[in-house]
Amino acid sequence: MAFSVVLHQVTFLLAVLSLRTSQSKVLGEPLQLTPEIHTVSLQSALQEANLEWTVPTFSHQELNIVFQIEISRMRTSNTIWVGNYSTTVKHEETVHWKWTSDIPLECATHFIRIRAMVDDAQYPPQSSWSNWSSWKEVNAQVSVPPDTLLIFPEDRLLEEGSNVTICLMIGQNLYNVSCKLQEEPIRGEQLDSHLSLIKLNNVVFLNNAGTNINCKAMNGTKNTFGTVLFVSKVLEEPKNFSCETRDFKTLNCLWEPGIDTTLSWHKQRSQHYTLYESFSGRREVSNHRNSHTWQITEDSQETYNFTLTAENNLRKRSVSISFNLTHRVHPKAPHDVTLKTVGATKAHMTWKVPSRGDYTLLCQVELQCEGEVIHEHNVSVHTSANYLFSDLEPDTEYKACVRCASANHFWKWSDWMQKKFRTPEAAPSEALDVWRDVRTENGRHVVTLFWKPLLKSQANGKIISYNIVVENEANPTESEQYSVRAPALGTNLSLDLHPYKIHISANNSAGASPESLVVLSSHSGHEEVHEKTIKGIKNGFNISWEPVSGDAIGYVVDWCAHSQTQRCDLQWKNVGPNITSTIITSDAFEPGVRYNFRIFERSVEENVRLVEKQRGYTQELAPSVNPGVTIHNLTPNSFSLKWQDYASDFQSGFIKGYLVYLKSKELQCNPNWERTVLSDKSVLCKYDVDDPETKTLTVENLRPESLYEFLVTPYTSAGQGPNETYTKVTTPDVRSHMLLQIILPMTLGVFLSIIVCYWKSQWVKEKCYPDIPNPYKSSILSLIKSKKNPHLIMNVKDCIPDVLEVINKAEGSKTQCVGSGKLHTEDVPTKPPLVPTEKDSSGPMPFVFLENFTYDQSAFDSGSHGFIPGPLKNTPHQLGLLAPPNKLQNVLENDYMKSLVESPTEETSLIYVSQLASPICGDKDSLVTNPPMPVHGSEYKKQMALPGSLTSASLKENNLTS
């Protein structure tokens, strides 16, 4: 039994050993697997050759074989490419392989052959190839007419950056062929007399219409031969590919497509995009370049794996994403948003969101004001929500915004839903910042009130007006109220010198602000304080002061923003109680402008008191103008200069003094004068008037009959005034100056004498030789009175008339007033008798005037009794009509006296002066038109005898006074 087992084992081992020995002999020999090429198909447009071959001697089921392929051009000995191709070959299987030529296949004949070698793990490595197959000729050439030039490839499509070889097949009658790429010349390689190759590397995209290649032969026709290269932009991979849902019914997939590769002439359409979902196996072509909508079915999965492929005629590009549907939720915007204001500071907001079962959204609420987010809050929402905004400003426009996103897996916020609203107005919350300016005019206070506009947060609405209540502290029950319409920021009041309290408040549609108080004392506007000079800093002033009292509750600093213009634009700054310095800055401050500051102290009673004045410049500048100068006291050796001052507020700096420049030919400077050289190299003398209050200077030690030039210019810490044109002055000579000193006083004396004589000539004439003396105006009468001689006064009873004259009154003439004041209107004859007749005695009689004459007593005493009356130019009744009653006596006296003066004094020694009583009737300036019945009567005036020594004097005095 044991022997049998051993025998079987030995037999098995011998059989295995025999099989291995047989296999070693077979595998050790090289396998002769010579390929056989069956067909070669060409695709000229792609410059591709597709080979098909088999291995006739292949008897195995499957082996991995390496094929070596050799390609020659134009002749078999001109090998242009050798390469290996490894593949698994099955029994009686046809092998396929594709080769792309670097030149168009139409340009040359190609030859292809193949050999093989087993490369399989079942066999030991082979050291030799099989035999070569027979050459397979690949010929796509076309015949070329003698006068034709063929260019290949024709209308080739390729990507930007590719390399391409252009083949020129030249007819036998053509030579010296030149080509251009667009307008640039290109050169090629001459393979033979009828074949040339032009290699273009890294071609660029020029335009969608393609790139032109044009060729022309020198000896040929004028025809141009060419082709077009359609260069496409490189197809890009889609970017930012993502998918999301807004309603769990559709998936919206978006991507960035990149550059469009469309070419003209339908050579290439725009790339198209395909979506493939691997779990469901669905494939859909998008109708858009950058988006696609994927429908979600009820039985769709929650996880998706998408591949997006972009494809054109030249290549494909793909990207993939995978996601869970609940993680890609992009909610729609909230809807039904409402806002209701609650008072002036609150607003209530409500909204709804799209609902899906128990799906929770997180909503973000924002409140914006003037484009800025002032409040933000998050709210969890299922279907609807609300929110209350508080601490809002009255009369302010707000914008409430809300958006939502998935609460569990945040992906994207929804679009904002916005709603604008405005809160209602409220009464102003702050009192006005008020200031005043007080001045005294004509015994009254002229008060100018100023206030600053409230900030928007303080006004709480549109300010409509300002209320002003003026309360007289002397009589509190008396108050006046004024209203100033907005947007005015001030007003003027005229008040007496009593103390007043002025209450000011701002009003809007909702109410009034707290009152601001201005207190005026009786001495407001009369404060006199010290004014000091300060130095400015950059863009402002550092102002400090000494406290006056210990009970100050604050200070106010005010100034004019435009001190050199009529518009002051008063500004002020409030300072706390324990602060005695502040920095005033303003963009309105300018160099070279003086600013005046006043510091006021506020008391507990709201009284303000001026404690200090300060003035200064942010930057002093040199004076821009020189003062006007006049010359005085010009002598041969000196003259005086006097210049004007100008307003300090218009100075560009603090005037420290004046420089006086003097030019002369001698160039010799007086003592205290400095010899200096100006920037224009001119040499002159300079004198420094270092007292700015001094406005005069006497220049001495000059030469007579010499020309001098001078200039007066002010200077500040920044420099002196402009170097303007000098004023010329010539000193007179000594003799002419002395002569002038003599002639001028004499001329002045003569001139004054002439004026005095002319002024007194009329007086001398009246005193020395009057035309008609007036005894009533003469001083002789006063002499007579002073003597009080009663015999010089003539009584009526002593007067015997020499002539009685009856004055007729024409019919219809005006009624005359007589001495008694009674009227007589009866007609009288044209020639009245000297005495009344009997016939007329019974009837009405005219009033009789009896003239009494003043006579010269000396003439009477001498015994000369002749009576020579002077001619009367005007009768009494004529004078009565032409002159008022109170003037009648003077008229008669003047005329009569004139007639006497004209008569020679030798012819008469007795001079009679008529003294006719003036009529008196009520109104002595007018005659009565309806007089009462006349009463007959006559009246004598007293007559007086004048001594002869006084007659002439009386006449002269009368003439002067008349």
Curated annotation (Swiss-Prot):
SMART domains: FN3. A motif (WSXWS motif) lies at residues 413-417. One of its GO terms (molecular function) is cytokine binding. It is a single-pass type I membrane protein. The keyword Glycoprotein applies. InterPro entries: FN3_dom, FN3_sf, Hematopoietin_rcpt_Gp130_CS, Ig-like_fold, LIF-R-like_Ig-like, LIFR_D2, Type1_Cytokine_Rcpt_Type2. Residues 818-840 are annotated as: Disordered. Its main location: membrane. Associates with IL31RA to form the IL31 receptor. Binds IL31 and activates STAT1, STAT3 and STAT5. Capable of transducing OSM-specific signaling events. The OSM/OSM-R system is pivotal in the differentiation of oval cells into hepatocytes, thereby promoting liver regeneration. Heterodimer composed of OSMR and IL6ST (type II OSM receptor). Heterodimer with IL31RA to form the IL31 receptor. This is Oncostatin-M-specific receptor subunit beta. The gene is Osmr.
